[in-house]
């Protein structure tokens, strides 16, 4: 006897007007994640997923393309306005925010949520080039 295939129901797309854009910008990469207000991921993109490799992932242009891709995917869910939370010291911070606005998302808030230690872990040693 063959097992009967159950009919898979098509997953309905959520409709979210308000979103939250989390931009994590390091020296080596930029990751843009767009979530709903509860924190469930709608779309994400990084400099690597848009085709950059190696040191080019840390550039502002790579961050711009990553933010653009994430914004386009999020707009399919009906996202119109976003709050932006930026984390990290990387080069792609400003470029990613500007790119979100250029893609047609209205930015209602920009907040820096970079974690700052109260003298926690010892930092890596200084580079001598």
UniProtKB/Swiss-Prot annotation:
Transmembrane segments: none annotated. PROSITE patterns: RIBOSOMAL_S11. It comes from the Bacteria. The keyword DNA-binding does not apply. GO terms for molecular function: rRNA binding; structural constituent of ribosome. The keyword Ribosomal protein applies. Keywords: Ribonucleoprotein, Ribosomal protein, RNA-binding, rRNA-binding. It holds the Pfam family Ribosomal_S11. Gene3D superfamilies: Ribosomal protein S11. Coiled coil: none annotated. GO terms for cellular component: ribonucleoprotein complex; ribosome. GO terms for biological process: translation. Part of the 30S ribosomal subunit. Interacts with proteins S7 and S18. Binds to IF-3. Belongs to the universal ribosomal protein uS11 family. Located on the platform of the 30S subunit, it bridges several disparate RNA helices of the 16S rRNA. Forms part of the Shine-Dalgarno cleft in the 70S ribosome. This is Small ribosomal subunit protein uS11. The lineage of its organism: Bacteria, Bacillati, Bacillota, Clostridia, Thermoanaerobacterales. The gene is rpsK.
